[in-house]
């Protein structure tokens, strides 16, 4: 039974990594969340983004979200709030949106974060993230990870056509130096899909990417 009056919090960097791609690009990537509250009700802040080295461009914010969360079943929370994404450059036009998420652990201990966003123009997008920890020893884990993005409507202003837009699969090996600190290494593969892939090719870009990552998972 959840403890109604208990309040605590956590800051977790699930991914804080340096990436080297098959196009000889270097990236710094972060994926973090912070929360405060009890077992039933919490406030979350989530952020993901990347910065490509030596391209002269500011970091790209994939998402920054402030969410209210409610426990609706064992291991499952429903969340709702506000978010933004885009360049972090001063004065940059960012996409602001409402977000609704189903966040928790599926059977067989798959960690899920499924979200639906609606921006100021009414454009609807869906993002699915799943990861799973395979314990190799008391201190080491192998973690496969899957992420998919799709749009239910065309969002021309943000170069996001309707349909499935991208898929990303990764595999990381991490070793826990302590409960709070675990360095890791890994690889990933990502690919644009459907009309998004056609647009990337038309613009002279690569529709797929492979990368090697070195990073650390930590919380406090």
Residue ranges and their predicted role:
Residues 1-57, 70:
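Outer-membrane beta-barrel initiation region
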Residues 36-38, 70, 104, 116-118, ...:
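Residue-level signature of outer-membrane beta-barrel architecture
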Residues 171-176, 206-220:
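Outer-membrane beta-barrel "beta-signal"
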Residues 91-155:
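Detector for outer-membrane/organellar transmembrane beta-barrel domains
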Residues 39-45, 74-79, 108-114, 137-142, ...:
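Repeated loop/turn-to-beta-strand initiation elements of outer-membrane beta-barrel proteins
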Residues 9, 28-32, 62-66, 96-100, ...:
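Hydrophobic, lipid-facing positions within transmembrane beta-strands of outer-membrane proteins
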Residues 19-28, 50-62, 84-96, 116-127, ...:
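Solvent-exposed loop/turn segments connecting transmembrane beta-strands
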Residues 15-18, 45-49, 80-84, 114-118, ...:
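Transmembrane beta-barrel strands of outer-membrane/channel proteins
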């Amino acid at each position: 039974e959840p403890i109604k009056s208990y309040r605590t919090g956590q800051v977790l960097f699930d991914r804080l990594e340096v990436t080297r791609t098959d196009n000889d690009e270097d990236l710094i990537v972060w994926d973090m969340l912070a929360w405060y509250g009890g077992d039933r009700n919490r406030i979350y802040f989530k952020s993901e983004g990347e910065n490509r080295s030596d391209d002269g461009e500011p970091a790209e914010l994939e998402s920054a979200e402030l969410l209210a969360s409610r426990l609706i079943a064992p291991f499952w929370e429903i969340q709702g709030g506000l978010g933004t994404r885009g360049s972090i450059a001063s004065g940059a036009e960012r996409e602001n949106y409402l977000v609704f998420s189903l966040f928790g652990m599926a059977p067989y201990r798959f960690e899920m974060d499924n979200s639906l966003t609606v921006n100021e123009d009414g454009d609807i997008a869906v993002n699915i993230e799943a990861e799973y920890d395979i314990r190799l020893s008391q201190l080491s884990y192998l973690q496969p990870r899957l992420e998919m993005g799709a749009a239910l409507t065309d969002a021309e202003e943000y170069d996001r056509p309707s349909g499935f837009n991208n898929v990303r699969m990764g595999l990381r090996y991490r070793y826990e130096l302590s409960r709070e600190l675990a360095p890791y290494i890994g690889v990933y593969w990502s690919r644009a899909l459907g009309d998004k892939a056609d647009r990337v090719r038309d613009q002279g870009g690569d529709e797929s990417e492979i990368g090697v990552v070195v990073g650390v998972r930590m919380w406090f």
